[in-house]
Amino acid sequence: MKKQEVVEVKLNKTIYGGQALGKLEDGKKIMVWGGLPEELVKVKITKNKRNWAEGIVTEVIEASKERIEPKDQDSYLSTSPWQIMNYDFENNLKRSLIIDQFAQHAIELNLNDFTAPEDPYHYRNKVEFSFWWNNETEQIDLAFFKRGTHTKQPVNETSLALQNINKVATTIRDVLRQKNIQARDLKTLLVRCNQSEEVIAELYVKEQDVDIQISHTEVGAVGFSVHYSNPKSPASIKTKTLFTSGATKLEDKILGNVFTYSVDGFFQVTVPIYEQTLKTIKEHTDPKKPILDLYSGVGSIGLCVTSPNQNLKLIEIDERCVNEATLNAKKIKPEAEIILSSSEDAVDHITNEQTVILDPPRAGLHQKVIDRLLKVKPAKIIYLSCNPATQARDIALLEQIYKISYAHGYNYFPRTPHIENLVILEVVS
């Protein structure tokens, strides 16, 4: 079997990570994008390893009753491969995947609740577009990278984004077309929108001598800027700012607290459901106990769940996040202590009398953090995770002295395989 070969596969189930799992004729496992359990499909092989293969569905021979038409026919595999499934099926699947991850560590998780937005579309407040040159029309298009490739798929919009993001992005595209800007000079377009529907857009270019000066009002935004970004780096990093018009930062309210943030900074992409999570976290904190917020980012958890007289300490490794947390703390909780450090290098700040909040990256907790928690035994740990697999791994270690008192799953990113999970741990007396 060779790469790009098309084979017929019966799919069995959806696995953690988002693909459907099936078997090839020789018994080798194959993980497939664009398929659902119980479907018979034709699959184009994209990877062929010794013990497993990957592929993308090219034709559905026998469809699942849960299959629906994707809203973004041409680009859903790039951004949101679960557009093909019924929304109730998606939410039930995410619930079961959380439980399965804990079961792999011999933890029988009782998921107390699972929260998902009513509308699975138009929720993202931040989108990054690439660019593509159309040889037929001889003009640029917005684009996303095709999943698992370096090739691009032209798009007009994405159904995941807030409507004003699509509107501003296509307007900028049209202005760039009028100026005859070439795709080879452009890197990405980053567009962000707050809950007041104000938009700021940042255009990243590969050449310093590109002359693009567009008023923010011309594209319907409150701010627009152009930045040279080193073309040797795949990421959209600001090497030099070439042009700015209007605002450079946005404001948003989270549980009544005003946060200021940069377009390219870290801020929640789905604020309404994040607020619901924070309300639940606050219900599980003791206002009389100090809070330590590890992996705190811009501080939105700690700053939103503490009471006026409650002691708060934030630990964060990213200097830009710390700067934004400091700026926001001045307005919300001036006495908060904010420390620039990795959590594993700040374990001495973990003490017995605190409520400890954990919101680590996908890799989960550092072993030093786990060891310190087991040593000093804070009475309560609140663990929010964007990766239930590593969360379950960490909690299996913490179960030496902790028990799960509450668990709540969240669908922050509908139509994608991403899952958030909140677990409350209490020390066993």
Residue spans for each PLM region:
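Extended interfacial segments that mediate partner engagement and assembly in macromolecular machines
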Residues: T58-P70, Y76-L186
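Short, acidic/hydrophobic/Gly-rich beta-strand patch recurrent on exposed beta strands
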Residues: A20-E25, L142-K146, A325
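Hydrophobic beta-strand signal
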Residues: K42-K44, E128, L292
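Rossmann-like S-adenosyl-L-methionine
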Residues: K2-E8, Y16-A20, D209-S429
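Short, aliphatic-rich beta-strand segments
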Residues: S196-K206, V258-S262
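Terminal RNA-binding accessory module
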Residues: M1-S75
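A short glycine-rich, hydrophobically flanked beta-strand micro-motif that places a catalytic Asp/Glu
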Residues: L111-D113, R184-C193, F224, S341
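A short, glycine/Asx- and small/polar-enriched loop/turn
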Residues: Y121-N125, Q195-E198, P417-H418
